[in-house]
Amino acid sequence: MDALRLPRRPGVLLPKLILLFVYAGDCLAQCGKECHSYCCDGSTPYCCSYYAYIGNILSGTAIAGIVFGIVFIMGVIAGIAICICMCMKNNRGTRVGVIRAAHINAISYPMAPPPYTYDHEMEYRTDLPPPYSAAPQASAQRSPPPPYPGNPRKYSSSQNRIRDN
């Protein structure tokens, strides 16, 4: 247990950390085929960051997972809150067998439905439109449409008929 404790003098830990960072510079990954696109633009052959490599791979998945996780946790919290509110409203804890069929029927049907009465709105009204007839209605003769406002050489079909006569 004593071996896991930090030294009592804080000045001992700092030089060891500095030595670790100095010698760790030789252990950086060199640019290979899989890491070539993440290398610095300078002359050093070391990769800039593994976080950039991992970040490009996992960024979309991580964001979608975080959003899904937050929505899922909010749903669970809402469900628990609704359950607690229902229990508080009833002033009792929920137990198996408390809700019986008679209790459900009393909630759903507090009394007998009213007797059936004839609905006067369904009667045939005299102000309905006349029934559909297949005979075409007589339409008044229409005058031809006005000439096309664009190019004077273009004529509408009615003007072509008039011009041909």
UniProtKB/Swiss-Prot annotation:
Keywords: Membrane, Signal, Transmembrane, Transmembrane helix. It holds the Pfam family CYYR1. It comes from the Eukaryota. One of its GO terms (cellular component) is membrane. Residues 1-29 form the signal peptide. The chain crosses the membrane at residues 62-82. Residues 83-165 are cytoplasmic. The keyword Oxidoreductase does not apply. Residues 154-165 have a biased composition (Polar residues). Residues 30-61 are extracellular. The keyword Signal applies. It is found in: Membrane. It is a single-pass type I membrane protein. Residues 125-165 are annotated as: Disordered. Belongs to the CYYR1 family. This is Cysteine and tyrosine-rich protein 1. The gene is Cyyr1.
